[in-house]
Amino acid sequence: MKASELRKLSNEELKEKILELKKKLFNLRFQNKIGSISNTAEINQTKKDIARILTILRERELNKTNG
């Protein structure tokens, strides 16, 4: 998911997306441990998506306090 797409979402939508991605990450890690995952790169991609969302939320928080 691109950062430009994420920036269009509201804070509430981003927080919901984080919860969704964290659940997905949990399931991917579980599948990886039992050996049933076919694309292990999806784990790293999900972690990066979570980081992107957290970065956008932090930027908005800083802009709100400074601006």
Swiss-Prot record:
GO cellular component, one term: cytosolic large ribosomal subunit
Keyword rRNA processing carried by entry: no
Keywords: Ribonucleoprotein, Ribosomal protein
Cysteine disulfide partners in this protein: none
InterPro entries: Ribosomal_protein_uL29 (IPR050063), Ribosomal_uL29 (IPR001854), Ribosomal_uL29_CS (IPR018254), Ribosomal_uL29_sf (IPR036049)
A Pfam family reported for this protein in Swiss-Prot or TrEMBL: Ribosomal_L29
One of the protein's GO biological processes: translation
GO MF annotation, one: structural constituent of ribosome
Family per record: Belongs to the universal ribosomal protein uL29 family.
Family matches, as PANTHER family: 60S RIBOSOMAL PROTEIN L35/50S RIBOSOMAL PROTEIN L29, LARGE RIBOSOMAL SUBUNIT PROTEIN UL29C
Name under which the protein is recorded: Large ribosomal subunit protein uL29
Gene symbol of the encoding locus: rpmC
